[in-house]
Amino acid sequence: MAPRIEYGKAAPGLYDAMDPLDQYLASCSLEAELLHLVRLRASQVNGCAYCIDMHWKDLRALGATEQRLYGLDAWRESPYYSMRERAALGWTEAVTRITEGHASDTEFEAARGQFSARELADLTLAITTINAWNRLSIAARLVPGRYQPVVVAAA
């Protein structure tokens, strides 16, 4: 299987437009594991195989256990996630499924109870950004399996 659109060739500036969002998020107020957990969950909801592969590998590189990764599809029934993570995952699903009834006040209030205003803004940007990447990846039929995480040595 080959991708049906090669964005780098077809629209060289596309990645230049998206990359600043990820650069901002890399140094935002949220911890890296939470960001990748949110990205993986949104990718599961959207059915983006390429992004599922990527963020699964990123989480493993950060030390996430297989138990937490396998349980993510059923996070509401799984004991592996903190209240903060649960609030982030609920908000992730609400924003990702926004066409099914808008982002609910219940999920927003749960998130607001766990995150500062800055963190909640960063979380919402992370969710919005991964949803854009999911749509780009699905539309192009990007092939999963080749991504390898960059492991950064601790300072």
Annotate each language-model stretch with its function.
Residues 1-155:
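Hydrophobic alpha-helical segments
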